[in-house]
Amino acid sequence: MLGTCLQNVREKGPLVHNITNYVTVNDVANVILACGASPIMSDEPQDVQDITAICGGLNINIGTLNVRTIEGMLAAGHKANELNHMVLLDPVGAGASSLRTNTAVNLMQEIKFDVIRGNISEIKTLAAGSGTTKGVDADVADAVTEENLDEAVAFAKAFSEKSGSIVAITGA
């Protein structure tokens, strides 16, 4: 299945709009290029609707938040939904601060996300509307182990159904 997805990306070569973490922006661009797509980065509210309109998808990463980026995320997300473009949310650090948690929850209320990816604590925070994380790492109490793997999978499936999104629990 992954091979088919990559083949489709290489054949279509979509432009992907990224409102992403300044720490990882270069890595994100290079991975998108390596997959056969083209990245474009813009978080300026006066620019994002035009950029989103010419793209095949939108990646929103809340790793470096400020008032301007939040405004840009909302504007781009609304435009992507209007155009039926794929939209992904990476709720980096949701649960670490009230700004991150409230922003992630608000984005989910305002924007239809096709995919939500995050560590287990970030996803639990989105599901409950509050939670804790160890910065950008999952809280130790949330660690997925052999013993609770079935429970974690059931949780991810339930949240996927509730949110209407594909849910990917990744990282530590």
Listing of model-derived features with the role each one plays in the protein:
Residues L99-A172:
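Conserved phosphate/ATP/ADP-binding segment of small-molecule kinases
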Residues T69-G118:
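Glycine/small-residue-rich loop that forms an oxyanion/phosphate-binding "nest" at active or ligand-binding sites
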Residues V48-Q49, A96-S97, K124:
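Short secondary-structure capping/turn micro-motifs that flank functional sites
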Residues D27, D43, D47-D50, D90, ...:
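Acidic-enriched, low-complexity/disordered segments with a strong bias for Aspartate over Glutamate
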Residues L58-N61, M86-P91, G135-V140:
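Short beta-strands and strand-loop turn motifs
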Residues T64, G93, E122:
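Active-site-proximal loop/turn and secondary-structure-junction residues that shape catalytic pockets
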Residues M1-L74, H78-N81, M86, V153-A172:
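Small-residue (G/A/S/T)-rich helix-start motifs and N-terminal tracts that mark the onset
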Residues T20, R68, G95-A96, E147-N148:
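Residues that cap or flank secondary-structure elements
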